[in-house]
Amino acid sequence: DYEIEGNFRLYCTDVSLLLAMRDFGLKQAIVEGTLTGNTKGGLYESFVADALVKSGHALHFYRNETTKREIDFVIQGGGYVVPVEVKAGRAAANSLRAVMRSNEDIGLAYKVADANVGVSEDGVVTVPHYMAMYL
């Protein structure tokens, strides 16, 4: 696979400003812990994108049109391609695991989720959201 120059995603690099641009209902849902769906996922993706950029990473993403699989971020670590999947909750990272199975060159992958630090049998390293800045 290769990079397509005109294919990109935009993220707000200041999550506070992103929240300030939204209505009060969003802020209330965050405080009450009732935020759900694509809004919740998009907010967590923006937070992780901000952390990765501030850690010096260039942001790329992966999408396979045939299998409909997407990886939220692809960064470089130690000269290797490292996929990073962001989950707002504890959901499984099926796309991440499928990409790892189909590409033996990927030895390290991260799942950023509402979970503790851990490593699965297939080599996916899970880190909590607040540790995204350390990837």
Task: Describe each PLM feature range.
Residues 127-135:
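C-terminal helix of von Willebrand factor
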